[in-house]
Amino acid sequence: MAKIINVIGREIMDSRGNPTVEAEVHLEGGFNGMAAAPSGASTGSREALELRDGDKARYLGKGVLTAVANINGPIRDALMGKDATAQAELDQLMIDLDGTENKDKLGANAILAVSLAAAKAAAAFKGMPLYAHIAELNGTPGQFSMPVPMMNILNGGEHADNNVDIQEFMVQPVGAKTFREALRVGAEIFHSLKKVLQEKGLSTSVGDEGGFAPNLASNADALAMIKVAVEKAGYKLGEDVTLALDCAASEFYKDGQYDLTGEGKVFSANGFSDFLKSLTEEYPIASIEDGLDESDWEGWAYQTQIMGDKIQLVGDDLFVTNTKILKRGIDNNIANSILIKFNQIGSLTETLAAIRMAKEAGYTVVISHRSGETEDATIADLAVATSAGQIKTGSLCRSDRVAKYNQLLRIEEQLGEKAPYRGRSEIKGQA
């Protein structure tokens, strides 16, 4: 038995200079695991609660000492002597101990950090890589694939200080034969884009996720810049590389309308979906995330109806990695893909349940980072372990993003042909 003998919580810093929670789980025999909880900027209103102290005299109220105390107190007491390999039981213990719908007593950040640290400790106990252990927990032992990266090379919205409304403009190297090659393609395009921006006298400062954040006149201008960068890097847009957007539309949804201040335009729900569709007709956009507000289910139905057969429509704020909400979406034919973020739901077990539900319904899965990240690279292992098919973990800049890509390189090296890179076929509507 992988007996837990200690659980430790601490306050560390994330990539935006805000505190977050780190946990360690120690087992008999000297095995241990350590993990950190990420934090989002544009968050869905139904996400599990990230517990912050609210003491304005300390870290502007963003301290996490209460969550840390919950780890070092009640969570530690509940898990002492338990088997770290029994992940579902550990997670349920913490969920029951919290006793609330959205983990607002102990904090999803506290529960998640311990949940992931326990998984890492259990993997160490079993003498296997984390991805292999998670695959066993997922009921898919030995089944792996390398994810297609969604590389956020140009930022707007809440992730940048500019006048671009759409939050993320991404490239997906779908024509690559391996993950290593896909990463190289993305890196070359990133550097090409930097040169294109410099030549136009535009800023090459970067946003939270490492993408450039220039002031552009419109969202279409951002796509045009990326098109030039892809071609200058020597690749064919639509063939070697497809584009993806994260609109984060909840951020500019006001009074039932979509107010694109950067564009100087206001759209109805259907009007904004039509606007996005027009962009997909002009550029090879294969995936659109949060193309409407999380509460605009009627609008989502229309968007799915007009684009769902050809374009991957990803629910992030819409589904918040929550099986109850995802089931409603599946039953009502809303979207066709889900973004998976550990900290939206707050435990590894619940995350795996959401991935399984999505796959069983024929929805694609995109494993995602948050804008506030750490050096923790667990999402890389999760993507491979569940054969998710896609990963979204920022640009080719900032070590908090690159850490995940580097872990994927290591995993691909270890697994070789056992973890194929399937490219375009992983994206809904592109097979």
UniProtKB/Swiss-Prot annotation:
It is an enzyme of class 4 (lyase). Gene3D superfamilies: Enolase-like C-terminal domain (3.20.20.120), Enolase-like, N-terminal domain (3.30.390.10). It comes from the Bacteria. Component of the RNA degradosome, a multiprotein complex involved in RNA processing and mRNA degradation. Catalyzes the reversible conversion of 2-phosphoglycerate (2-PG) into phosphoenolpyruvate (PEP). It is essential for the degradation of carbohydrates via glycolysis. Belongs to the enolase family. This is Enolase. It comes from Shewanella woodyi (strain ATCC 51908 / MS32). The gene is eno.
